[in-house]
Amino acid sequence: MGAGKTTFYEAYLKEPFPTLVPPLRHQQQPFLDERRSFAVEDIRVDTQLLERAKAAGYSTKVLFISTEDANLNVGRVLVRMSRGGQAVTVSSVIDSYRESTKNLSEVSKYADELLVYDNTAHRRGFCVVAHLIAGKLSKTAQTIPDWAAKVFGKELHPAEQHEKPGRGR
């Protein structure tokens, strides 16, 4: 809650994936059975859904969005509530923040692609932190946010800065 998942979906995913299925197995299964594309927005990545989707022949892609601090998420949710959004408790926002990263480091074993975004900076947009393909690190940001470093440990190494060759004499 408050990391920007819905905002990201509305801005970037709604057109290619117009069907946003709730994170409920009984509502997802018909899509899997009929091999229809869909997106799921949830606080925690459902690795069982990824396994079922892969078994059904799907290519799976997880887009994970977080921020540096649960208090930032709380602030965003409070603003949203002041504008008529769904009322939630501060403790549930903090709990969902903690819960969201619990299995994230394992997700790359289940998803064909995992894109990790940081949405900490106000009005600067979603920043790609890491892109993993088939469990292998494809690219990382030059600066890894602390929250991502805690989740992935040494798995994420900042992209190497290559010096430009100097001019000969």
Role assignments for model-derived ranges:
Residues E68-L72, D95:
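Short gly/pro/ser/thr-enriched loop/turn and capping motifs at secondary-structure boundaries
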Residues L24-E68, S100, L115:
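Glycine-rich phosphate-binding loop used to anchor ATP phosphates in small-molecule kinases
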Residues K14-E15, E68-D69, V79-R83:
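A short linear boundary/processing microfeature
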Residues V74-V77:
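Conserved SF2 helicase motif VI
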Residues A3-F38:
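Conserved substrate/cofactor phosphate-moiety recognition/catalytic segment
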Residues V79-G168:
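Conserved GTP-binding G-domain of TRAFAC-class P-loop NTPases and closely related GTPase folds
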Residues G4, D46, H122-R123:
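Glycine-rich nucleotide phosphate-binding loop and flanking beta-alpha elements
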